[in-house]
């Protein structure tokens, strides 16, 4: 008897026509692993470690219309700190890069490497250290500020 299981994952396209795949038990990619860059003609860029951090950021920006500049950033998602160097060409176009990487050793190391790759004229702002120093990533931060303990709905 053959056992057929349904398989599913949420997929996010990357810059090499591959897909970053996620579900509750799996984190991987189909085809080639790469960064994902979304250019919108803005002067500044937001840098994320993964797509769920980007989605959390989008929700945060939606919840904070009093900070309109949150919606005026181009996007770079590393999809893995191991390939952070691939972001050099894209990030070098910007005068300011807002980094929302994880507050852990790989995130800090990726930030250090990226800082060394960028032109001296590019300002790299460590937003994770400023905005959510007690959380590992943007998703954890968003969950924390929206928890019922803080008087908000989840």
Write out the residue ranges for each language-model feature:
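Short, small-residue-biased leader/transition segments that mark boundaries at the very start
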Residues: 2-4
């Amino acid at each position: 008897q053959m056992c057929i299981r349904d398989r599913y994952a949420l997929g996010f396209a990357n810059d090499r026509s591959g897909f970053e795949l996620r579900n509750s038990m799996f984190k991987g990619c189909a085809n080639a692993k790469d960064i994902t860059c979304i250019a919108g003609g803005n002067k500044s860029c937001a840098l994320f470690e993964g797509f769920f951090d980007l989605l959390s950021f989008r929700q945060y920006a939606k919840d904070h219309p009093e900070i309109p500049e949150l919606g005026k950033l181009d996007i770079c998602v590393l999809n893995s700190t191991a390939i952070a160097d691939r972001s050099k060409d894209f990030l070098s176009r910007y005068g300011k890069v807002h980094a929302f990487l994880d507050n852990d050793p790989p995130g800090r190391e990726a930030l250090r490497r990226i800082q060394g790759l960028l032109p001296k004229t590019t300002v790299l702002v460590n937003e994770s250290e400023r905005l959510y120093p007690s959380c590992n990533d943007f998703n954890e931060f968003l969950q924390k500020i929206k928890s019922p303990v803080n008087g908000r709905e989840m």
